[in-house]
A protein has these predicted regions:
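A short helix->loop->beta-strand "cap" motif at the edges of active sites that frequently abuts
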Residues: 2, 39-41, 66-69, 170-172
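Predominantly a Rossmann-like dinucleotide-binding segment in NAD(P)-dependent oxidoreductases
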Residues: 76-149
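Short, Asp-centered acidic motifs that coordinate Mg2+ and/or phosphate
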Residues: 18-19, 99, 173
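Short loop/edge segments at beta-strand edges and connector loops
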Residues: 6, 45, 53, 72, ...
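Rossmann-fold dehydrogenase core element
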Residues: 57-75, 96-99
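Alpha-helical elements of Rossmann-like donor-binding domains used by nucleotide-donor carbohydrate transfer enzymes
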Residues: 10, 19, 31, 58, ...
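Beta-loop-alpha module in the N-terminal Rossmann-like domain of NAD(P)-dependent dehydrogenases
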Residues: 2-61
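Contiguous beta-strand/loop segments that form the cofactor/metal-binding neighborhood of enzyme cores
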Residues: 134-179
């Protein structure tokens, strides 16, 4: 059966808990992932795992020292539709990929208090959905970018729109998100 805990600390102190999922607002990911690692728990952390490269390095160091599994919850690589797209492209079923357009959008501007709209909680479109446009093309094609050009729009301290055009190993990709 499931056990309920009245705090995150109590959850981490429970010897019957082997792993935790960290779905908190972005700015809390590193803090609670590190606490979970220190408590000897495997960690599945919502994206983005960290807000800064140095924080990510600290997570990697803690993971390496602990021997625990620590992973980012990133749906693209595990989703059957993207696995199939990768298989079809790699096998040549659709011919040579020359251009890819990827877009992801939703409108949450009517919710200014939403954590995705607040800079202090790590909000912004690139951290929330922008990664899916770029990541899906990169995963499906197996191509890495060699040049990028971007346009970005910000409102109230967070990015709400971006369009990135990239050259990816002979292909051209355009990645757009708006939030």
């Amino acid at each position: 059966g499931l056990r309920l805990h009245d705090s995150y600390e109590a959850l981490l102190a429970d010897p019957g808990v082997a792993a935790v999922y960290v779905p908190l607002p972005n700015h809390l990911h590193v803090e609670w992932a590190l606490k979970a690692i220190a408590a000897g728990k495997h960690v599945l952390c919502e994206k983005p795992m960290a807000m800064q490269a140095a924080e990510f390095d600290a997570l990697n160091a803690a993971r390496d020292a602990s021997g625990l599994l620590v992973s980012e919850a990133y749906m693209i690589v595990h989703h059957p539709q993207w696995q199939k797209a990768r298989e079809l492209i790699a096998g040549g079923a659709i011919g040579r990929v020359e251009h890819v357009d990827a877009a992801f959008s939703y409108d949450n501007r009517a919710q200014p208090g939403n954590i995705r709209n607040r800079p202090e909680t790590g909000g912004g479109g690139i951290r929330d959905i922008g990664v899916y446009t770029y990541g899906s093309v990169r995963f499906a094609t197996g191509a890495e970018p060699v040049a990028l050009q971007a346009r970005l729009k910000r409102e109230n301290g967070v990015d709400t729109f971006a369009q990135v055009t990239g050259e990816m190993a002979g292909e051209v990709g355009r990645f757009t998100y708006s939030a």
